[in-house]
Amino acid sequence: MFFAAALCCIVSAVMVSCGKDNPDTPEPEPTPDPEPEVPVTPKDTVVYAVGQEAVPGKGYYYATIWKDGKRILLSDGSYDAFCNGAYADGETIYIAGCEATGDLVDDGYYEPYHQNVGVIWKFKAGEEDKAEKTVISDGKYSTSPIAVTVADGKVYAAGFDSPDYDRRAILWTDGQPQYLTDGTTDALAYCIYSDGKDVYVGGYVQPASNKQGGIATIWKNGVAQSLTSGNTVAKVNAICVDGGKVYAAGSEKESGGRWKGVLWIDGVAQDFTDYVGTEVTGLYVKDGEYVIEGNMTETNSAKDICPYIWTSAGAQKVAETTLCQGVGLAVAGNDIYVAGNEVAGYDSEYNPINIAYLWKNGVEQELEVEYKNDFSLWGVICAYVEKK
């Protein structure tokens, strides 16, 4: 599926002959000293899965990460919190998420609740207990940063807020928001990717002329590019840049219909599934070979949702689960990690049982949990850290 690059060194020997009786024969150039070899630092692959775990008896969640399966809490359980996405910049890890610590809302319909505030956690791998938290919204409106990246020394996050019924897509730069849409129609930002100094955000924008439609959209450095016309509902859920080409994976459907999977390469669409309820949450591309991750149904029934990956060779089911969504992808060498969430039934009090999974090459990995009936993942990354 993936092709490892091999490094070949070709050494040429040049024979120089000098005639002793010819005074015009130039002296040979001195052989330069060889460049010193730069030692390669051995690296370990560390896998971070991010999400949430229920605080027992409280009805809300801890913001939780799992480092190689070990559970680590980023919140103290005194309020609702969760992690949406992550990024590794060398050995520095960034987590995008939310905490319900904003303005109190009492609308008369529900129990009073606090608005979600957008946050970014930052820590060095191995120093998770020293995580620094940066709040990136004021708590006035519910705010959700979904994804995070780093480019040219700056931290970028993509997500949305909800000042009214229609949401606004947002790009944050070092905590400062740039509104990609103005809120006059609905819009969401689902993903972010950096390539050099360029930052790409993927999502959707509802056209003003068709409230039943949705335009799959990429914002490059804040400038929007529409991938669809708005006559259908379409969205970009994951972006990669490889070989100078921009790959965007997402879904498209007719209003009221079922989703099909779409991969856009430099804006040109190619379908990778039929209209079978396909959702995308991950994309990896190297040397033109892609891996798309998400879920789809096999029988057009919502009860038959399974996690999948798609490559140029076709579709591959990740696990034999039902009512299970694929929610995250990471690739390290030839290893493929997929995160998923399953609705596994109901407990004795008719509360849904939510169980998260992390698979490595299709094999379930152990996740440490204290409350096994209600925990979820929303992303997974691989970090490369120096061997101790």
Question: What are these model-derived regions, one by one?
Answer:
Residues 1-4:
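Bacterial N-terminal signal peptides that target proteins for export
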Residues 10-45:
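Bacterial Sec-dependent N-terminal signal peptides
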Residues 39-388:
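Residue-level hotspots at or immediately adjacent to binding/recognition sites across diverse folds
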